[in-house]
Each structure stands twice: as structure tokens, then as C-alpha cells.
Amino acid sequence: MVSHSELRKLFCSADAVCFDVDSTVIREEGIDELAKFCGVEAAVSEMTRRAMGGALPFKDALTERLALIQPSRDQVQRLLAEHPPHLTPGIRELVSRLQERNVQVFLISGGFRSIVEHVAAKLNIPTTNVFANRLKFYFNGEYAGFDETQPTAESGGKGKVIGFLKEKFHFKKIIMIGDGATDMEACPPADAFIGFGGNVIRQQVKDNAKWYITDFVELLGELEE
């Protein structure tokens, strides 16, 4: 079993760090914000809570929630313009510090690429380092489903992305950071997992993560030492 001090060393020597987005890099759950914007917040929030607790297979939960929301292309664009996601305090500095150390930073999300790319731009993360679900629209902009071939559409999808990154770039040490069960499940193949509870505490993650933080300042401090 890896000790806490070994985990800290792993983090400081990682050549890639992968962040979950909803409730980790940003304060909100993107799908809940979209539901609120489209007027179906209560039903969708309950489904998100069940999905996060691991009670529903991820793809089933995503399909059900999107069937309720039926977001159009215009609604997604208006959401970003009128209610842009809020970055979690400390994330901008942490990502910037990692990039200064030539660590590759990736965003791996079960949320939507259109929202995650908006977040990536704020953090100077290239879109090639973004893995998320793609919404599909008909030619008139109405909702047409989502791309079910994306690894992030499946339970265990974040682990698949990390496995792909290791194979493609030959990273020696990849760290996964996130708030949810799907993030914790990505280790292995990630070499270490850091649980994050700065926006919402998922008890299952808090109880099982070997390293659990509630403020990104703690990780910044590790890099400065």
C-alpha cells in the first residue's frame, strides 16, 4: 500500500496530471447547470446524485438526464454566455504551476465538450488535452443525442482515457484528481488518485482516497517545497 509521503512524492514527480472538471476544476456540475437553464433542474439533480454515488451505470444516467433536458445548440451557447462556469479557487494557479514544470495537464470529464473546452481555454489547456462527451444536434440545432463512442460516455471511461494516454505518450506517472467515484476508479491505470472535496464531499471518495484535499492550495504547497 502506498503511504501518504510516497503519494506526495508521486505527485511532485508526475509527468501528467488529469483533472475531473465538474465540482473539481469548476464549482458546478455542468449537466445540472444545463438542466436548470432548461427548466428541469430538480429531476436531473437527483439523477446526478445517484450517478455520482455509483448507483446507476454512467451511460444510463447520462442518457436519462439528457432525454429530460433535450438541450439545443442555442441553449448550450446561451448557457456559456449568460452563466459561464466558475473556476474553483486555486485551480488556475495550480495548473499554471504544473505547466511551468512541463507537466502535461489533461481534463477528463463525463460532462460536455462544449462546456469543458470553454473551461480549458480559461486555463490555457489545449483542446487536444480535453476528453469529454460530445452532444449531437440536428441541422436545425435541436438535440440529437450524444456520441456514445466516446470513452467518457461509459462507466470506467476515465480509466480508459488514462490507459490511452500512457500508451500514446509513454507517461511514467499519471495522477488523477477529482471529486467522484468515477475519478477514483481511474486509479489504476493512474498511478495515484487525489480526492477533492472543495466543492462537494462525496463520502465514498473521502472514506477511500489515500490522499483527500479540500483546497488546491495544499497541492500548490507541495510543488513549492
Curated annotation (Swiss-Prot):
Signal peptide: none
Residues noted as binding L-serine in the record, renumbered to the chain: D20, V21, D22, S109, G110, G111, K158
UniProt: Mg(2+) binding residues: D20, D22, D179
Cofactor: Mg(2+)
Cofactor binding remark: Binds 1 Mg(2+) ion per subunit.
Keyword Acetylation belongs to the record: yes
Keywords tagged on the record: Acetylation, Amino-acid biosynthesis, Cytoplasm, Hydrolase, Magnesium, Metal-binding, Serine biosynthesis
EC number(s) stated in the UniProt entry for this protein: 3.1.3.3
Alphabetical list of CDD domains matching this protein: HAD_PSP_eu
Associated pathway: Amino-acid biosynthesis; L-serine biosynthesis; L-serine from 3-phospho-D-glycerate: step 3/3
GO biological process: in utero embryonic development; L-serine biosynthetic process; L-serine metabolic process; response to mechanical stimulus; response to nutrient levels; response to testosterone
Enzyme class: hydrolase
NCBIfam families listed in its UniProt record: HAD-SF-IB, serB
Biological role stated in the UniProt entry: Catalyzes the last irreversible step in the biosynthesis of L-serine from carbohydrates, the dephosphorylation of O-phospho-L-serine to L-serine. L-serine can then be used in protein synthesis, to produce other amino acids, in nucleotide metabolism or in glutathione synthesis, or can be racemized to D-serine, a neuromodulator. May also act on O-phospho-D-serine.
Record note on quaternary structure: Homodimer.
Protein name, per record: Phosphoserine phosphatase
Source taxonomy: Eukaryota, Metazoa, Chordata, Craniata, Vertebrata
